[in-house]
């Protein structure tokens, strides 16, 4: 699973996901893509599950680019533990996704295969997504 090799600080504030994506909203690498339509935190397990679903359906043909990276540490306290006594330990890594963010890109396969592969991948994610295609010039 994806996670940073090293970070400046072990834990982060929760924060809020406001506004729309300022960057990473266009197709940069592939012909087809999966774009987020709502804000949410997508964890590393979801990203990996989506990647596996996409590559399995494509039968290793073509190429997949993951355009998001889980760089936010999410902490949790153990169950049945009283409040206080400090912040919990890091449970998993997540990525804050804003609306309009391109999450996955695909190239080297037909539109039907790409559409179905990304549909299967989107089922693994906790955000609503849309299939996008490069406009032929």
Swiss-Prot record:
The keyword Methyltransferase does not apply. SUPFAM superfamilies: Ribosomal protein L16p/L10e (SSF54686). Coiled coil: none annotated. One of its GO terms (biological process) is translation. Keywords: Ribonucleoprotein, Ribosomal protein, RNA-binding, rRNA-binding, tRNA-binding. GO terms for molecular function: rRNA binding; structural constituent of ribosome; tRNA binding. Signal peptide: none annotated. GO terms for cellular component: cytosolic large ribosomal subunit. Pfam families: Ribosomal_L16 (PF00252). The keyword Zinc-finger does not apply. Transmembrane segments: none annotated. Binds 23S rRNA and is also seen to make contacts with the A and possibly P site tRNAs. Belongs to the universal ribosomal protein uL16 family. NCBIfam families: rplP_bact. Part of the 50S ribosomal subunit. This is Large ribosomal subunit protein uL16. It comes from Allorhizobium ampelinum (strain ATCC BAA-846 / DSM 112012 / S4).
């Amino acid at each position: 699973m994806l996670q940073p090799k090293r970070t400046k600080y072990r834990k982060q504030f929760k924060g809020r996901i406001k506004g729309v994506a300022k960057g990473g909203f266009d197709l940069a690498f592939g012909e087809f893509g999966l774009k987020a339509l709502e804000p949410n935190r997508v964890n590393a397990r979801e990203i990996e599950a989506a990647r596996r679903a996409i590559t399995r359906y494509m039968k290793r043909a073509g190429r997949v680019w993951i355009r998001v990276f889980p760089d936010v540490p999410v902490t949790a306290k153990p169950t049945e533990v009283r409040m206080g006594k400090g912040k919990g330990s890091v449970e998993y890594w997540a990525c804050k996704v804003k609306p309009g963010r391109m999450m996955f890109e695909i190239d080297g396969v037909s539109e039907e295969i790409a559409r179905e592969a990304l549909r299967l991948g989107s089922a693994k994610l906790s955000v609503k997504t849309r299939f996008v295609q490069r406009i032929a010039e």
